[in-house]
Amino acid sequence: MESIPVIFLDRDGVINSPAKSHEYITQWEDFIILPGVCEALRLFHDNGYKIFIVTNQRCISRGIASSSQIDELHRMMTEDFARNNCYVDGIFICPHGYNDNCDCRKPKPGLMLQAQKYLEDSEGVTVDKTRSWIIGDSKTDEEAGVNYGINTVLIGGDPVSKNNGMKHLTAHDILESAMKILEGSN
């Protein structure tokens, strides 16, 4: 089976402005797409990457938002992307809380495994882990990438993981992440 490079993106803090501490973004009017997102998405697609959003949304398990509310928010996000000539190839959500003992909540790699299965089933390709990355703004995102066996970019922090055969970068935002990843792939 052919393998292809994939970019996995956390949502809050990478795609959109993060919510205030202990709050959740559940409505479109609170969803502020960060500068450079569409430019980064276009750069990745132009260079042969598939792009998936992988996001923990425990607001669902806590009853703060329904799955359909989050789906609607993501529908509006993808429509906004389309108006700006960019897109993602899929969105994978963990609706569970910390103590639900699921396989999908980051730092577990379940969301990335779901995306991999989607690629294998729908396109007959798999993830090339040596050329794939997760971009996130938390240690949990970075740990998920390490647990899945891919390279990581931590936005706004210092990488925790070192010397495990993978690349670990830092960046100010998604656009700088794209430039660093693409610069290193040439």
Which residues are covered by each model-predicted region?
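Structural recognition of alpha->loop->beta junctions
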Residues: H74-I93, N163-L182
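Substrate-recognition element of Asp-dependent hydrolases with the DxDx(T/V) motif
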Residues: V37, L41-H74, Y87-N99, G145
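Metal-dependent phosphoesterase signature
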Residues: I15-P35, I60-Q69, R83-C86, H96-D103
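Short, electropositive alpha-helical surface patch
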Residues: R62-T78, D103-K117
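Conserved Lys-Pro-Asp/Glu-containing loop-to-beta segment of HAD-superfamily phosphomonoesterases
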Residues: S3, R105-E142
